[in-house]
Amino acid sequence: MIDPDGYRPNVGIVLMRRDGQVFWGRRVRRDGWQFPQGGMHSDETPVEAMYRELNEEIGLLPEHVQLVGATPGWLRYRLPSQAVRCNRSQMCIGQKQVWFLLQLIGDESHVQLDQSENPEFDHWRWVSFWYPIEHVVMFKRGVYARALCQLASLAQQVVGLEVGTMPQYVQDICLLNVGYKHLPNWVSRY
């Protein structure tokens, strides 16, 4: 399913522990690490797709998490030219994503990376809230920065402490990838 602009609808998942650390998974047979994410089926809402992807990629069920919130709209990123692909005469140039913030309320022993025939991850760990922005593959850094910036106030409310000061590189990525000349007020709070 690709929209008329060439973007594939997708959901991204930021799974957070009670201490504010977030799930970070290493992709199978690759060096890259990322958050869980996946495409939506044509008959799914973003929330339904998120719960399906949560189970397929990391083995968690709805009762293992609390849905804290989501980005208010679609966040887009373009694929590098070598990754652009056609699907039945439609060209997919990137992904548009709704990002969800979930709090793990179950035991982390419920995390199982082998829930599907084609696992997405082969290893995982907990990292600080802002860490993924600098360590995800380059073409996703902008969308990660926008997603985490939009979810940071929700994360802070849930864990009851600062998710940490937004590092300068995150501010730079926001400026470069969103086109701001100055950081908006909602960014300067962090």
From Swiss-Prot:
Q: Which cofactor does it need?
A: a divalent metal cation
Gene3D superfamilies in the record: Nucleoside Triphosphate Pyrophosphohydrolase (3.90.79.10)
Keywords attached to this entry: Hydrolase
**Per the Swiss-Prot or TrEMBL record, what residue ranges does the short sequence motif Nudix box cover?**
38-59
Documented EC number(s):
3.6.1.-
Record keyword Translocase present: no
Q: Which CDD domains match?
A: NUDIX_Ap4A_hydrolase_plant_like
Q: Name one GO molecular function term.
A: pyrophosphatase activity
**Every Nudix hydrolase domain range:** 6-149
Family the entry assigns: Belongs to the Nudix hydrolase family. RppH subfamily.
Q: What does this protein do?
A: Accelerates the degradation of transcripts by removing pyrophosphate from the 5'-end of triphosphorylated RNA, leading to a more labile monophosphorylated state that can stimulate subsequent ribonuclease cleavage.
Read off the PANTHER family from this record: ADP-RIBOSE PYROPHOSPHATASE, DIHYDRONEOPTERIN TRIPHOSPHATE DIPHOSPHATASE
User: NCBIfam families this protein is in?
Assistant: PRK00714.1-4, PRK00714.1-5
Q: What is the official name of this protein in its record?
A: RNA pyrophosphohydrolase
Species: Xylella fastidiosa (strain M12)
